[in-house]
Amino acid sequence: MMHITHLDIRNFRNLKHIELHPSKGVNILSGANSSGKTSFLEAIYLLGLGRSFRTVQLISAIQAGMESLRVVAKVKQVGGSHTAGVEFGPAGFRARINKDTVKKRSQLATQLPLLYMSSYSHVVLDGGPRYRRQWLDWSLFHLEPGFHDLWWCYQRTLKQRNHVLRVHKPSWQQEINAWNKKLSTYGEQITSLREAILFKLQDSVSQLFTALAHQPISPVTMEFKQGWARTVRLEEILNESLNYDRAAGYTRYGPHRAEVAFYVDGKDVREILSRGQQKVFCYSLALSQANLLYRTKEQNCIFLIDDFTSELDADHRKRLLTLLNKLGMQVFATTIESLGSEIKAHPNIKEFHVKLGQVEEMV
């Protein structure tokens, strides 16, 4: 079971110097607003993805009066352990795994798979299609070797095709034909992988949602819309839509326009589920990713939850904690109020109190 055994955070927002040994199971961080709870999660997020969920300007995360920030963790996993560290300051962003410099931020994500939930996680349902594509592609990134490179090849080719569409050159027709072939090759590979992974995720989402909702619910079904008509090949529709694409200046069809729809009893979950049920459904989507990762590679991921009690009553929190322990995930979850007796019945749980940038274990 992969988990962080030691965490060292320095000069990260209001967290001056935090060192702790978290539980390999669930870690609850309670404290008032602006105490540093979300900054704690953000630091782990930075360690796992090389970016923040709050800002694109990391300089704003450096504590006032300091030159740099640093986050280091010792990570235990099957077969050994490693040390991961990130630093940002005058020299820019630097990351290491053990003593090796990390050249691509995707290497961090491979070594420390993360899932993140917050009060804004409804965006996977309410937001545009790209959020549902991101949900699908998370599993492909962690389970399909080469998917990350394949996706970037597609993105670069899409950018080149769009450029040719906008720039009127004498040779544009020849160039567009070449880009159409490349784009369709990459695009159909991505689509095939997405369809296969969605099939694997669907049953897990349905089972997890039923377990968390704790009430009779029709099975969850999903519809994958690949981004162009299924009756034709991608290259064919790229050729057919060329005049429209050229007038519009962008590519209308392809996996960058794909969509996933979620249904319960044949109805869109956004219409049939209450707000609280939708939150439970969002947890089911995230946990299905973790479950598939473990079943496929016997690899755990770390789950970050901001505002754990938001839109969840005590019964739902109890079932969620039980399920998180059962799945063997390391969890860092924030709350305003201490959960106290609510967590005593669960094994492998530690609670920490966060106040004015200081984190202390509650005994």
UniProtKB/Swiss-Prot annotation:
Pfam family, one: SMC_N
Record GO cellular component, one term: cytoplasm
Keywords: ATP-binding, Cytoplasm, DNA damage, DNA repair, DNA replication, DNA-binding, Nucleotide-binding, SOS response
Predominant localisation class: cytoplasm
Cellular localization per UniProt: Cytoplasm
Binding site for ATP: G31, A32, N33, S34, S35, G36, K37, T38
Domain of life: Bacteria
Keyword Methyltransferase: no
One Gene Ontology MF term: ATP binding
InterPro entries, alphabetized: DNA-binding_RecF, DNA-binding_RecF_CS, P-loop_NTPase, RecF/RecN/SMC_N, RecF_2
One BP annotation, GO: SOS response
SUPFAM superfamilies (alphabetical): P-loop containing nucleoside triphosphate hydrolases (SSF52540)
Protein role: The RecF protein is involved in DNA metabolism; it is required for DNA replication and normal SOS inducibility. RecF binds preferentially to single-stranded, linear DNA. It also seems to bind ATP.
Similarity comment: Belongs to the RecF family.
HAMAP family the UniProt entry points to: RecF
Stated name of the protein: DNA replication and repair protein RecF
